[in-house]
């Protein structure tokens, strides 16, 4: 990906974009820094250039600020775009800036985007919300931030370029921040409580909720976070009717299975074909799985096929070709190798690991 849009004359745009945001240094978005200060002029003539900028990959300046982890420039953009549709613009992979922040595990960026009005239930091209992605890469702190009610916005704020539209005369006598009308705030307060809860039941295009994803990835801490947030512990995935308990058994994740059982998940849940979690556990080599289920009152299987069916082998996954959606982030990001997603960026990142 290229760098960020320039903040000046259009003729200079290519040079700015080719240089990459990372080369601008930590003061790039500070008053008087490269691209700001004198170039802003008396009005907002620079705004169409910045907020209209899109790379060949569909990334906006906001996407690039997140990818390059350039917080000063991110803060600058959010000062003008918070509460507007710009927050949820999607690139060619369907990713918003919030999706990218979750993939990168950048908690502070997730918090800022969330507080600025980024949509929680926007789906990227595989149907993943930001919470799905946080579950896929094990970004616990990001998930924790997303599982909180949205922070309230300030009640007093003047108009800005994005809030008022390009046809209105900008008010240049105020600090540039987004417009939050009282009517919008009242509506926001009514919906904020439900807003963050809706993502718990959001399904990706494989029919997996964030809890399904966390269970498949054997992530005990993530499952605990989702449980505490109120996720449905018995919701089946749509392909075969597997509950989170079935998925935990198929992943042979005894610690996840125990956590779900202690939290009240139904040990008698049945797949569409009638198989119970215990029936599935008896087909696995790990004896702890069946022991845990019996200890929590799981009924003994009756009349269940002793052979693994197509569903019980975890064949349902979203491990289809996801392209190189992580490549540019990894190349341009300053993240350490230990914080990258658990599989190479050029390979698909499956929700449903194949059984050993």
Swiss-Prot record:
Outcome after substituting residue 19 to A: No degradation
Keyword line: ANK repeat, Cytoplasm, Nucleus, Phosphoprotein, Repeat
SMART domains according to UniProt: ANK (SM00248)
Source taxon at top rank: Eukaryota
Region (Disordered): 149-193, 298-356
Family membership noted in the UniProt record: Belongs to the NF-kappa-B inhibitor family.
Name used for this protein in its record: NF-kappa-B inhibitor beta
Organism: Homo sapiens
């Amino acid at each position: 990906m290229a760098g960020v849009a320039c903040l000046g004359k259009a003729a200079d745009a290519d040079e700015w974009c080719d240089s990459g945001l990372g080369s601008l240094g930590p003061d790039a978005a500070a008053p008087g820094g490269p691209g700001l200060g004198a170039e802003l002029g008396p009005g907002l003539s620079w705004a169409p250039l910045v907020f209209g900028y899109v790379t060949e990959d569909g990334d906006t300046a906001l996407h690039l600020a997140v990818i390059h982890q350039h917080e000063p420039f991110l803060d600058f953009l959010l000062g003008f775009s918070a509460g507007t549709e710009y927050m949820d613009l999607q690139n060619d992979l369907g990713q918003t800036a919030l999706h990218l922040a979750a993939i990168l595990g950048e908690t502070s960026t997730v918090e800022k985007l969330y507080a600025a009005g980024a949509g929680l239930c926007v789906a990227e091209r595989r149907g993943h919300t930001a919470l799905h992605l946080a579950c896929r890469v094990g970004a616990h702190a990001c998930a924790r931030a997303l599982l909180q009610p949205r922070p309230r916005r300030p009640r007093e704020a003047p108009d800005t370029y994005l809030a008022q539209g390009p046809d209105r005369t900008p008010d240049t006598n105020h600090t540039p921040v987004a417009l939050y009308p009282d009517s919008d705030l009242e509506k926001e307060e009514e919906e904020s409580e439900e807003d963050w809860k809706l993502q718990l039941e959001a399904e990706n295009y494989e029919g997996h909720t964030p809890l399904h994803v966390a269970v498949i990835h054997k992530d005990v801490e993530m499952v605990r976070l989702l449980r505490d947030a109120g996720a449905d512990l018995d919701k089946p995935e749509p392909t075969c009717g597997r509950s989170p308990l079935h998925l935990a058994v198929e992943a042979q994740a005894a610690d996840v299975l125990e956590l779900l059982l202690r939290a009240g998940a139904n040990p008698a849940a049945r797949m569409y074909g009638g198989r119970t979690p215990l029936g599935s556990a008896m087909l696995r080599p790990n004896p702890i799985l069946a022991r845990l289920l019996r200890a929590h009152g799981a009924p003994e299987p009756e009349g269940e096929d002793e052979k693994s069916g197509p569903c019980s082998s975890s064949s349902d996954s979203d491990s289809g070709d996801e392209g190189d959606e992580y490549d540019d982030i990894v190349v341009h990001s300053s993240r350490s190798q230990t914080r990258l997603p658990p599989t190479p960026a050029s390979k698909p990142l499956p929700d449903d690991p194949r059984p050993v």
